[in-house]
Amino acid sequence: MNASRCDLLRRQFDLTWSLFEYHLERLDTEDFLWRPTPLCWTVHLRADGRWMPDWSETEPDPVPVPTIGWLSWHIDWWWSTTIELHLGRRPRDREDIAWPGDAEGAIGRLRELREEWLGVLDDLDDAALDAASPSPWGQGPDHTVAHTAAWVNAELMKNVAEIGQLRMVRAASSG
């Protein structure tokens, strides 16, 4: 049996998402806002009623530990940007992407992004994978849709592992 590149990318994505669902089903709002250490990046309720993330244009040293809330905002930012660019639309500025404010909203948003991305994946064939892919991160003209899809899988897998680890550490430390 010879699986296509599209099938491999989709199966890898589905595996990553199934691991994510394991954690999403167990999260509550307190988990999203739990600070595992004093040096954290999290989300904050601003006076205008929007939840916005900590951010620095240059990576701090040491790097702050992100909260689940910050990570879920981060996923929304990079994934929505990737989807919008792939669909030929102008993505929102990072500063325009707010965290939803609670577990239900954050989990709902992540599941919306999954559905949008599945629409992208399901429209791909091997020829489409070889097309140039626009990217806000400047990978250059040799960057293909296949590279982008593989990167989404890897970045999501990393973020899922981070969220899962934070959730398990919080659960173990409170019990």
Positions of the model-derived regions?
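Acidic/histidine-rich alpha-helical segments that form the ligand environment
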Residues: A98-D130, H147-M157
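Short, contiguous alpha-helical
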Residues: A3-D96, P134-G175
